[in-house]
């Protein structure tokens, strides 16, 4: 089965990876159904911006943006962005999520996903020293000028040294076989 990751890797041979992922998310059925849109990915992939428009497609019973739409609009990015930033020597998985609604939204919402070079170095160092650990990535859905926070999503992301992770999986399989 062809995966989104394989398609992105193939397309990145011809177009910059940020452009491939922006286009890919925006045409992908799994992301299009959120009604959100990726509006910007920096060339270094350290910054991603999305917009979740308020429309009939995501209005709930009381005519505000449905909470599930808010969550699904931001869900894939902390993990996907980090995977692309730290490379194939690491395993990155979503572990858990919390969503906190601050106020009902009746306007377009915006979110940014930002990692710094320093954070990436810390993550790689920690994976080297501890083999596996988790981080919490907080994303705020705001109005365009960021003056009002409508929703905050906290994602717990698992990160592991890939060699360690493979050994851990092998040990788990061997234990079950006994």
Describe the role of every protein-language-model region.
Residues 81-119:
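Hydrophobic beta-strand-centered segment that forms part of the acyl-chain substrate-binding groove
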Residues 37, 98-100, 112-114, 140, ...:
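Residues located in well-ordered beta-strands
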Residues 33-64:
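Catalytic strand-loop segment that frames the active site of acyl-thioester-processing enzymes
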Residues 2-15, 105, 116-178:
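HotDog/MaoC-like acyl-thioester-processing domains
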Residues 56-77, 91:
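Hot-dog-fold acyl-thioester-processing enzymes
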Residues 1-33, 57:
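Alpha-helical membrane-targeting segments
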Residues 34, 46-48, 93-97, 107-111, ...:
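A generic structural signal for short beta-strands and their flanking turns/coil linkers
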Residues 33-38, 95-101, 122-124:
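Short structured motifs
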